[in-house]
UniProtKB/Swiss-Prot annotation:
Mg(2+) 1 binds at residues 283, 296. GO terms for molecular function: ATP binding; D-alanine-D-alanine ligase activity; metal ion binding. It is found in: Cytoplasm. Cell wall formation. Its cofactor is Mg(2+); Mn(2+). It comes from Shewanella piezotolerans (strain WP3 / JCM 13877). Mg(2+) 2 binds at residues 296, 298. Residues 124-329 form the ATP-grasp domain. This is D-alanine--D-alanine ligase. Signal peptide: none annotated. One of its GO terms (cellular component) is cytosol. Pathway: Cell wall biogenesis; peptidoglycan biosynthesis. The keyword Magnesium applies.
Length: 332
């Protein structure tokens, strides 16, 4: 039986570096059950340096090889890559652009789709273009008196706002503001994470998530799951990933079939319209008035022990190894 050499690239050096390593563990465990694959795990650090799990310095070159610094180690030919990196440079599309440049097949969304989803401003423009309802917002491109005034006016009109770094993970550089005196300092903090900032109306709503993925040539949208935050406020980075998180998750949300079908319809429309590939987690709000709003799309969702994507996939009747095998074999 012929084997395929798979590069499992993780880390990235960004704010979600540690979470990426946990997700890589999940991939590694699943790939270990598939004997047709040889897997080399390589960590990318904040300085752009590559290192194997054994601590060997190496690099991915344009010939689709992992070349080792040690002179006595032969290059490792790469047939396929899994960019298990949350945030930069994975979900931003940067690493995918390099893979495309060197003609290396890879798992996950392509570069342009990744960029469009990761930038919250671009994503919301796409949602509106696809006629998918989303939260009211405005965006700012500099820290200035004008930006402070615009955000303050939004707070007055909407009662409460979220200020979010536009080009960061969903819970990174994200702050709720209820008081006008907090606007300037919070904007300044958000701008340290991104050149652009988005201001959204705070929505009183339930947080629902759908796993949308491809398997055996079909696009699947699971029934929505639900995240219930202990603070009844916001699904923070710590609540999302910490082992002692008090947030509760339900793989199947307690909602009507009508609402579930509508959410799945929107999710499929977003997946197809934005040309996503292989995997995504698409997050929605269900307001107190029963309105469904698309919140955001994660093109490489977390795969930690408490993450929703693998749980929803399994609940839908698919094993993660079979899902990986299907997509690896079907990717050119």
């Amino acid at each position: 039986m012929s084997t395929t050499n798979i590069l499992l690239l993780c880390g990235g050096g960004g704010d979600e570096h540690a979470i990426s390593l946990l997700s890589a563990n999940y991939f590694e465990t699943s790939l270990a059950t598939l004997p047709q694959f040889n897997v080399l795990r390589v960590e990318l650090d904040v300085n752009g340096h590559y290192r194997t799990a054994a601590g060997e310095s190496c690099e991915l070159n344009s010939r689709r090889q992992i070349r080792f610094d040690a002179d006595n180690r032969a290059p490792w030919e790469v047939d396929f890559a899994i960019p298990c990196i949350h945030g930069f440079p994975g979900e931003t599309g940067d690493i995918q652009s390099y893979f495309e440049l060197i003609n290396l097949p890879y798992f996950g969304c392509k570069a342009e789709a990744s960029r469009n989803c990761f930038n919250k401003i671009t994503a919301k423009m796409w949602f509106s273009a696809l006629n998918i309802p989303n939260t009211p917002y405005l965006f700012l491109n500099e820290m200035s008196d004008v930006s402070i005034e615009q955000a303050t006016n939004a707070l007055v009109n909407w009662g409460s706002i979220f200020v979010k770094a536009a080009s960061q993970g969903s819970s990174v550089g994200c702050y709720r503001i209820d008081n006008q005196e907090d606007v300037a300092s919070t904007l300044a903090q958000a701008f340290t994470y991104s050149d652009y900032v988005i201001v959204e109306k705070t929505i009183s709503a339930r947080e629902l998530e759908v796993a949308v993925y491809e398997i055996d040539g079909e696009i699947v949208a699971t029934v929505p799951g639900e995240v219930i935050c202990s603070s009844n406020n916001f699904y923070t980075f710590d609540e999302k990933y910490a082992a002692n998180s008090k947030a509760q998750t339900q793989v199947v949300a307690d909602i009507s079939k009508e609402v579930s079908d509508l959410i799945r319809q929107y999710a499929i429309s977003a997946f197809k319209g934005m040309k996503l590939r292989h995997l995504s987690r698409i997050d929605f709000f269900l307001t107190d008035d029963g309105e469904v709003l698309l919140n955001e799309i994660n093109t490489f969702p977390g795969l930690t022990p408490i993450s929703m994507f693998p749980k929803m996939l399994q609940n839908h009747g698919h094993s993660f190894p079979d899902y990986l095998l299907s997509n690896i074999n079907s990717t050119d």
